[in-house]
């Protein structure tokens, strides 16, 4: 059965069955994009300043993706409980110019560039009562492209990576390359999680790798990439903490609210 109820743009679309796209072009886990569309083609697009669990999050749902085009195809009927449908599909086009304001470049991605991305399909179970779809008391469930191990989409560090290529698949096989920068960011993310656990236990942060038991994970004993200064240097700040490593004459930095960036 294919059904949808919400018709107003920027309504809370996941209250219907929907399809969702999450994009973090620069991979810093902040100021990422979310787009949700239901079977009526109703759109909810927003910028989220940081993940909900990092506090002081703002969801800018007054923002619209410039030039966004969506098209829904229903293989069957919509909102007709009397028959059985095969499903629905959606095609989405987002102009680069609508997204690059949050990207490290003012141009579209180059060959080999990678973005953090995830997809989700929210589904509600229903019963048909008096010829109407009525949700059961069970919560919705999600099918996702890159599983995160938790029913919670707002963990950009756990999203998948999409690599851009100039060649189409019928021209040439393009090798996916897991970048050294992403390996470094992931290792710094482990420090972030250890700081959170330490704070919950001690109500303060630590500038000591030893106190954080950072090397309990044996994989963290080795630098995540060649030429990385290791382990990270931690500084306590008025707002919490920051940590960095040096790599290729740049600093890779992470801070208390999870933002990770290159300077």
Where are these regions (language model features)?
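A short, surface-exposed beta-strand/turn
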Residues: 249-263
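Terminal low-complexity interaction tails
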Residues: 201, 230, 248-253
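General beta-strand recognition
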Residues: 20, 89, 242-244, 253
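Short, surface-exposed charged micro-motifs
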Residues: 34, 233, 251
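Secondary-structure transition/turn motif
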Residues: 93-96, 244-251
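Structural preference for beta-rich elements and adjacent junctions enriched in aromatics
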Residues: 1-192, 196, 226, 236
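Short, glycine/small-hydrophobic-rich surface segments
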Residues: 179, 190-224
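Surface-exposed, charged secondary-structure patches
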Residues: 220-246
């Amino acid at each position: 059965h294919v059904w949808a109820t919400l018709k107003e743009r920027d309504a809370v679309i996941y209250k219907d069955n929907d399809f969702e796209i999450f994009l973090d072009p620069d991979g810093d886990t902040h100021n990422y994009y979310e787009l949700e569309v239901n079977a009526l083609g109703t759109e909810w697009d927003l910028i989220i300043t940081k993940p909900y669990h990092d506090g002081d999050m703002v969801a800018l749902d007054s923002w619209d993706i410039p030039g966004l085009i969506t098209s829904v195809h229903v293989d069957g009927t919509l909102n007709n409980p009397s028959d059985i449908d095969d499903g629905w599909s959606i095609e989405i086009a987002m102009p680069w110019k609508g997204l690059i304001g949050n990207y490290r470049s003012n141009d579209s991605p180059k060959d080999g560039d990678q973005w953090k991305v995830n997809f989700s399909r929210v589904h509600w179970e229903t019963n048909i009562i008096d010829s109407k779809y009525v949700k059961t008391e069970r919560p919705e469930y999600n099918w996702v492209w890159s599983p995160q191990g938790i029913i919670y989409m707002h963990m950009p560090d756990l999203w998948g990576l999409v690599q851009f290529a100039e060649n189409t698949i019928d021209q040439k096989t393009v090798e996916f390359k897991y970048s050294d920068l992403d390996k470094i960011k992931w290792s710094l993310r482990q420090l972030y999680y250890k700081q959170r656990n330490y704070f919950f236990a001690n109500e303060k942060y630590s500038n000591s790798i030893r106190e954080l038991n950072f090397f309990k994970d044996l994989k963290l004993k080795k630098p995540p990439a060649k030429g990385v200064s290791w382990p990270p240097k931690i500084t306590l700040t008025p707002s919490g903490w920051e940590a960095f490593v040096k790599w290729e004459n740049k600093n890779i930095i992470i801070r208390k609210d999870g933002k990770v960036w290159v300077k």
